Amino acid sequence: PADPVATGTDSAVGFKPFEASYQILRSGKKHGEASRYLKRDGVGYELGYNSKISWLVFKDERKERSRFVIEQGRLKPSHYLMQRSGTGPSRHYELSLDWAQKQLKTEKKQVVKQIPWNDQWLDMLSFHGQIVLDIQQGKTDFVYDVLNRHGENRTYKYKVATEEWLSLPYGKVKAIRIERYGQGPDKQVYAWLAPELDFLLVRLWQSEDDVEQFDVQLSAYKAQ
């Protein structure tokens, strides 16, 4: 059969290229900045996330990207890359999904991982895009098979919780709050998407053991 990554993509309504900037907060104090972008990449898209954090003597800089096509309302990722530098060891994670050969390759050396192929796979970044498409289709509960950075399958579960107004560095926006569930009571993950900004991620908040880990808030947005 033909490789969908090579043959084309569907154009999704509301799935539009953008550039966005964020402030990374913890306990109300700014500790860094981040940016996200979506751009056309040949027949598909590239979704990227960059962040730079400084907290006391700790420094962390990350660059993350996912390339994918959209077919019949589903994202099909072909390549995922995450690079981390700063305090401690540098990291490089890479995944390649060959839909024609049904092979998953990992690491810089692109070693074939011996794991049963799954047509539902998403990576750590592309599943964000799938949430956007699913919300646009009216879905309120989402279950995804997500490959972690080592190419191991994980189940991610999210649900729509409510719609509410947020006051952000960007300004005041009305957003849909979605919550992750099923990962244990000690970890909470909330994300807010703004319909008026093409369902852009405008805030991301995480807590573990009742301690806030980060609060990423939109500061600037530009549609492409």
Provide a role label for each language-model segment:
Residues 1-97, 137-224:
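Acidic, serine/threonine-rich low-complexity disordered tracts
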